[in-house]
């Protein structure tokens, strides 16, 4: 069934909030009326270029190394059809619905700017897929992030043509039947249209946007869980003093320190050891959270800035312009997704570091020499009970896995198309791997949440702060106190899902009002 959420799409005006809406749930998209004038004018330019009887790449020539091959006018439609079917060579699991919706919405936003030469019926066809929640089957693997995301976008286009398979409400069916069920007509491509549909960075950008959304949620949740760990370990709040962080001046550091001050304020546990505590300084994993998590917040913001520009960009090739002497098709390289690859690699660093520091706090909480008087491995009768001993090993394993995954994908390149396309971005993989990294980090932070919550419960007779009590209560709604050894894997999964839900962030949202600079 069509969604009741609506999105009025104005070219070059997409926001991160709108993109999050598209990722999270089906939408009804409409295109601003002003766009159709530019769309029609651009298509008229293509018709004029064809009428000149001169070669124009991608319009009446072959592709890649075959660009010098001239195609006769009566085969221009076949040229575009053959382009799509020959380039539909993806492999692997299909992309999830939210990612595919992002791809289609950003492709509409690009084509609707009137520099790609397609007819309005092509754009309306994509809007029809979006509005009937028809999800093309797009395999996850097969793009190197230049020349555009050719293979995955070809699979998207197959559905528009009534070929291949797609999904409605999670059920796989033929694209032909899905279009008929929705009352939509398959599109027959005209000159330039196939290339316009598949040349672009929308897949890489959608995958990286998914990683960006996950990173935003994780940096927020890791902050509240990290504050819970500080209190559980009887740590100090003095390292969060505003004067320290103002002297350095980094936005993220200042904001995370402010959050820690507010999250811990009023804790009876903190008040219980303000005096007669011979510990001079806490370990870095407690004390340096503003410096580390704040730096993660800053680079998440940098990535968001890049992705917002890219989501509103025209990344087709060639592009259609009108000069004083008439229309021209200019070949360039906007399809090269290097900015997206850099954004993805930046997000990978943030996601890995959030998990890495969280793992260190788990290690601290189970270590009786560091945890402020908590029992070894956070359990009564240690020895008979192993407590959180091996839960920490899981956190360590995932943190180390993320360190390998965080290696920058953008430094890799491999030539393709007989060396015509001799430098590529690897942005598609760079963005895709962020999901697995985020799942790992969510599990690590979930284990820390279990450990910190356990530590809070051992401070009998003392309450943590009001804000942290709310976070602790959310945990205890899902997972009970660990009084003796039990099957722990389901508890870890429950805590992970609580982290991914971002529910722990809802009760202190006003403290994050200035965190994300693109909002």
From Swiss-Prot:
Annotated EC: 4.3.1.3
Keyword terms of this UniProt record: Cytoplasm, Histidine metabolism, Lyase
Is the Cytoplasm keyword given for this protein?
A: yes
Q: How is it modified after translation?
A: Contains an active site 4-methylidene-imidazol-5-one (MIO), which is formed autocatalytically by cyclization and dehydration of residues Ala-Ser-Gly.
Query: What GO MF terms are annotated?
Result: histidine ammonia-lyase activity
Lineage: superkingdom: Bacteria
- One GO BP annotation of this record: L-histidine catabolic process to glutamate and formamide
User: Where is this chain primarily localised?
Assistant: cytoplasm
Pathways involved: Amino-acid degradation; L-histidine degradation into L-glutamate; N-formimidoyl-L-glutamate from L-histidine: step 1/3
Task: Extract the InterPro entries matched here.
Answer: Aromatic_Lyase (IPR001106), Fumarase/histidase_N (IPR024083), HutH (IPR005921), L-Aspartase-like (IPR008948), Phe/His_NH3-lyase_AS (IPR022313)
Q: Which residues, renumbered to this chain, carry the PTM 2,3-didehydroalanine (Ser)? A: 147
Where is the protein found, in the record's own terms?
Answer: Cytoplasm
Q: Where is this cross-link: 5-imidazolinone (Ala-Gly)?
A: 146-148
Q: Name one GO cellular component term.
A: cytoplasm
Is the keyword ATP-binding assigned to this protein?
no
User: For this protein, what reaction is catalysed?
Assistant: L-histidine = trans-urocanate + NH4(+)
Q: Which family does it belong to?
A: Belongs to the PAL/histidase family.
Q: Which HAMAP family match?
A: His_ammonia_lyase
Descriptive protein name: Histidine ammonia-lyase
Q: What is the lineage of its organism?
A: Bacteria, Pseudomonadati, Pseudomonadota, Gammaproteobacteria, Moraxellales
């Amino acid at each position: 069934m069509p969604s009741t959420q609506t999105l009025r799409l104005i070219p070059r005006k997409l926001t991160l909030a709108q993109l999050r809406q598209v990722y999270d749930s089906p939408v009804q998209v409409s295109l601003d009326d002003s766009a159709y004038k530019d769309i029609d004018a651009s298509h008229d330019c293509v018709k004029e270029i064809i009428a000149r009887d001169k070669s124009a790449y991608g319009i009446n020539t072959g592709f890649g190394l075959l660009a010098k091959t001239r195609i006769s006018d009566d085969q221009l439609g076949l040229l575009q059809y053959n382009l799509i079917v020959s380039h539909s060579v993806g492999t692997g699991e299909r992309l999830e619905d939210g990612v595919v919706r992002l791809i289609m919405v950003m492709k509409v936003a690009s084509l609707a700017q009137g520099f790609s030469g397609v007819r309005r019926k092509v754009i309306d066809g994509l809007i029809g897929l979006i509005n009937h929640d028809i999800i093309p089957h797009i395999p996850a693997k097969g793009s190197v992030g230049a020349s555009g995301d050719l293979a995955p976008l070809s699979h998207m286009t197959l559905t528009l043509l009534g070929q291949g398979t797609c999904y409605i409400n999670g059920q796989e069916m033929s694209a032909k039947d899905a279009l008929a069920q929705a009352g939509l007509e398959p599109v027959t491509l005209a000159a330039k249209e196939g290339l316009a549909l598949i040349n672009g960075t929308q897949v890489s950008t959608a995958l990286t946007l998914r990683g960006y959304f996950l990173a935003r949620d994780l940096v927020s949740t890791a902050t509240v869980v990290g504050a819970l760990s500080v209190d559980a370990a009887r740590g100090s709040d003095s390292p969060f003093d505003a004067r320290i962080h103002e002297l350095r001046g980094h936005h993220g550091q200042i904001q995370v320190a402010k959050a820690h001050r507010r999250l811990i304020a009023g804790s009876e546990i903190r008040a219980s050891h303000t005096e007669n505590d011979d510990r001079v300084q806490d370990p870095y994993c407690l004390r340096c959270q503003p410096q580390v998590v704040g730096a993660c917040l800053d680079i998440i913001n940098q990535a968001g800035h890049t992705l917002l520009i890219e989501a509103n960009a025209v990344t087709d090739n060639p592009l259609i312009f009108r000069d004083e002497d008439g229309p021209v098709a200019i070949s360039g390289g906007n399809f090269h997704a290097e900015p997206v690859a850099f954004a993805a690699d930046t997000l990978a660093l943030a996601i890995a570091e959030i998990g890495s520091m969280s793992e260190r706090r788990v290690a601290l909480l189970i270590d009786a020499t560091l945890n402020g008087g908590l029992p070894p491995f956070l359990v009564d009768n240690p020895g008979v009970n192993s407590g959180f001993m091996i839960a920490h090993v899981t956190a360590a394993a995932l943190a180390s896995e993320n360190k390998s995954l965080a290696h920058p994908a953008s430094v890799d390149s491999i030539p393709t198309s007989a060396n015509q396309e001799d430098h590529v971005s690897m942005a598609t993989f760079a963005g895709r791997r962020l999901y697995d990294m985020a799942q790992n980090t969510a599990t690590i932070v979930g284990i820390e949440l279990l450990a910190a919550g356990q530590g809070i419960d051992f401070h009998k007779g003392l309450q943590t702060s009001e804000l942290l009590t709310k976070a602790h209560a959310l945990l205890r709604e899902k997972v009970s106190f660990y009084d003796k050894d039990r099957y722990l894997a389901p508890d870890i999964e429950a805590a992970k899902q609580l982290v991914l839900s971002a529910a722990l962030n809802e009760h202190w949202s006003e403290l994050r009002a200035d965190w994300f600079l693109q909002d």
